[in-house]
Amino acid sequence: MIRTALLSVSDKNGIVPFAKSLHEQGIKLISTGGTAKLLAENGLPVVEISSLTKFPEMLDGRVKTLHPMVHGGLLARRDFPEHMAALKEYGINTIDMLVINLYPFNETVAKENCSFEDAVENIDIGGPAMLRAAAKNHQDVTVLISPEDYAPVLAEMKANQNSVSYKTNLALAKKVFAHTAQYDGAIANYLSALGDDLDHKARSAYPETLHLAFEKVQEMRYGENPHQAAAFYKDIYPVDGALANYKQLQGKELSYNNIADADSAWECVKSFTGNAGGAAACVIIKHANPCGVAVGASALEAYQKAFKTDPSSAFGGIIAFNVSCDGAAAEAISKQFVEVLIAPSFSDEAKTIFAAKQNMRLLEIPLGTAFNTFDFKRVGGGLLVQSPDAKNVLENEMCVVSKRLPTPSEMHDMMFAWRVAKFVKSNAIIYCANGMTLGIGAGQMSRVDSARMASIKAKNAGLSLKGSAVASDAFFPFRDGLDVVVNGGASCAIQPGGSMRDDEIIAAADEHGIAMIFTGTRHFRH
């Protein structure tokens, strides 16, 4: 049974009504500093921690709860007679509930003007010590670190004469140890990223030790293949607009492959937000590769254009929009087999239409355009870490290397193709025109084979490549790849450049009479 609670929080959300409920249930309140002041101002009887310890807060508040009167009350096993005898001998009372938030270290170091001294002062010492003590003794102590836990714990207490079950206490203790581990990991990451000058702004993006924190969203029926076990974990602090922020409106549970493909689709379609090519963008993904990308004046037009690129591959694919999916788009999509459909929102009409296709998974995700801080790739015994491929080359950063200048419409098509190229597995060749992909060659070991594949895909879809723009994610190592795309119908090409045979490739472009641009930026994707 809970008789005494110690409250000390940096996040004051909900703490006053929670404390009032505890008081109404006859629970004694102990508190520290600002929390004690807030509770007293709201008419609650509260015992200051210094009154409990008979020792004043000191060292600017660095020492206030590190005392046997606190830790003895948290750690004593109620079912151990020798523990209870020791408490009686030293005049220590049990503390049955601990409500703690830690100093906001992550929020502090995220500030651009944060100094090393600011960071150090926001390393909590007493808080983690109390949390670990209470969580260790979870059979006797209820420990809360988040306002979201206040209501369910109160409800359980009211239903059980101020008692909380062992099951609940254990769940809360697990949450505490995960939280303190993440907290210490963030401190270690920050400190090991600093140089000898302790310059906050000059710290490395790649600390000497890297601690990652994720929380499990779901266990899956299987992984990439049925014989593989799998689970999905969410970043503790996902960026705005990340796939992990999805809200599933309907459909079966997401599979491992669904999530992997959905992420490719969502990241690709987000890159067209604000693009002058059209008000709406649609991306169709199959096996992590785009099989159709388009922009249009509406979601319906964008979808219809994207679908034309490769109707057969779109079967069972993942579709993403960067605008709301309305009824017109939903009506067209409902005629196709779709695994997952993603959009920032769905109209009521669209939801009604899709309700008849309950196996289709609908995901609603806020459209934020931020990129993940890091990209990761697991290798045997290690982890490759890099910044995301977030660079979008602007027109004024490009270099026209051919004798013929591109027309405005060719430039527009090349910019569109280049945006798509970043999301196609290497070697990547993409034909585009009028705000849509026409043929996509992905994942071939030679660039010329990707060029041939892209031409074949366009032909199979009945799409003309005459006058199209072509993008290559990396330089053409030989002129054969350029010859293939020009013979296929391309009138202009965009590529990074950088080959030892660039002069030969430029000469081939001039020989064919096409316009060619070097971006100076490569977009390998493996």
Swiss-Prot record:
PROSITE patterns: MGS. Pathway: Purine metabolism; IMP biosynthesis via de novo pathway; 5-formamido-1-(5-phospho-D-ribosyl)imidazole-4-carboxamide from 5-amino-1-(5-phospho-D-ribosyl)imidazole-4-carboxamide (10-formyl THF route): step 1/1; Purine metabolism; IMP biosynthesis via de novo pathway; IMP from 5-formamido-1-(5-phospho-D-ribosyl)imidazole-4-carboxamide: step 1/1. The IMP cyclohydrolase activity resides in the N-terminal region. HAMAP family: PurH. It catalyses: (6R)-10-formyltetrahydrofolate + 5-amino-1-(5-phospho-beta-D-ribosyl)imidazole-4-carboxamide = 5-formamido-1-(5-phospho-D-ribosyl)imidazole-4-carboxamide + (6S)-5,6,7,8-tetrahydrofolate; IMP + H2O = 5-formamido-1-(5-phospho-D-ribosyl)imidazole-4-carboxamide. One of its GO terms (molecular function) is phosphoribosylaminoimidazolecarboxamide formyltransferase activity. GO terms for biological process: 'de novo' IMP biosynthetic process. Residues 1-145 form the MGS-like domain. GO terms for cellular component: cytosol. This is Bifunctional purine biosynthesis protein PurH. Belongs to the PurH family. Keywords: Hydrolase, Multifunctional enzyme, Purine biosynthesis, Transferase. Its EC number is 2.1.2.3, 3.5.4.10.
